[in-house]
Amino acid sequence: MAERFDRIWHNARLATLREGQPGLGVIEQGVVAARDGRIAFAGPRSDFAADGDAPERIDCAGRWITPGLVDCHTHLVYGGDRAHEFELRLAGASYEEIARAGGGIVSTVAATRAADENELVTGALPRLDALLAEGVTTIEIKSGYGLETATELRQLSAARALGVRRAVSVRTSFLGAHALPVEADGDKERYIDRVCDEMLPAVAQSGLADAVDAFMENIAFSAAQTSRVFAAAKALGLPVKLHADQLSNLGGAALAAEFGALSADHLEHTDEAGAAAMARAETVAVLLPGAFYFIRETQKPPVELFRKHGVKLALATDCNPGSSPLTSLLLTMNMAATLFRMTVDECLAGVTREGARALGVLAETGTLDAGKWCDLAIWDINRPAELVYRMGFNPLHQRVWRGR
């Protein structure tokens, strides 16, 4: 009896990104077959059942198929716009001057608090659509622009709603420990009390967050304050991730590892002890070249140390209104290769397999393996390096989410 599938893509070249395979796990003359939204077969044509059939057979005409892209760190949902601040910066205004004038994160918090859920969804959709147009099939979206319970929950709900409005998998992170709200009057300890005692229990009860994030930095929260948030999150059964070592080395990478974090992100100032701790904890390093570029950082993340210790490397846009208004994972890869000297293979793994690992969803997506969701990106390219090499160019032929 013929083996039946829902859809078959044939005459394709596959970059499977499978673990344990050299390079990108390339298969020439490949076939992908989907059943019930999942990959039922991904491999050489010679291994595919001769009688395999489906109502829809797509001839890829030699195009490349990769796993659907994963953007594992974004702040996609927010109110307002800060393009005017960019103009002020170009005219010579400092961050401090902009903040004193009511700009910076304070302005985004005010605009986000003033927006209802529909307005937040409507504002985020063009940003999401830009990412989907480049083959993104899984995206992480953080809260962190409410800094009080109701708005944080509204941000998370809006993020989940995006996954209903569009064919994309959305993972959400609660980022209540992002910044200090104006009404806290500079009292970080009291605000962290509120995060741990009020916000986190409400978030956990709502079921709207898949993870808990925090920003550990001199301008944000200390190691002790971050530890309190993480301990409370773990007690509620929520995994953690951390904005770490972006502007200074406060030991964020090591603290993330101590709590078994899914990922530590930014990491420009991470030292060897931090890298080694991340390797032992299997915490993924998420590098964010868009923010590095946009705010003109000079300290690069220690890619060689991460390689030395075997830390997995992911890449993400860090899409946000203040430091990385970026909605292109393709450009992100080019930036990582050019600015951080990452290889083509590292970049492509960083926006597929390792991005999925950083979100704790590698069992479900990120590689072309039977049993995973059939999330694909099909490209009009001659070789995978083009996806990293070219700038301002989108060769996506088709995006497939869960087999359709």
Swiss-Prot record:
It catalyses: 4-imidazolone-5-propanoate + H2O = N-formimidoyl-L-glutamate. GO terms for molecular function: imidazolonepropionase activity; iron ion binding; zinc ion binding. 4-imidazolone-5-propanoate binds at R82, Y145, H178, Q246, S323. Binds 1 zinc or iron ion per subunit. InterPro entries: Amidohydro-rel, HutI, Metal-dep_hydrolase_composite, Metal_Hydrolase. GO terms for cellular component: cytoplasm. Keywords: Cytoplasm, Histidine metabolism, Hydrolase, Iron, Metal-binding, Zinc. PANTHER family: IMIDAZOLONEPROPIONASE, IMIDAZOLONEPROPIONASE-RELATED. Catalyzes the hydrolytic cleavage of the carbon-nitrogen bond in imidazolone-5-propanoate to yield N-formimidoyl-L-glutamate. It is the third step in the universal histidine degradation pathway. This is Imidazolonepropionase. It comes from Bradyrhizobium sp. (strain BTAi1 / ATCC BAA-1182). The lineage of its organism: Bacteria, Pseudomonadati, Pseudomonadota, Alphaproteobacteria, Hyphomicrobiales. The gene is hutI.
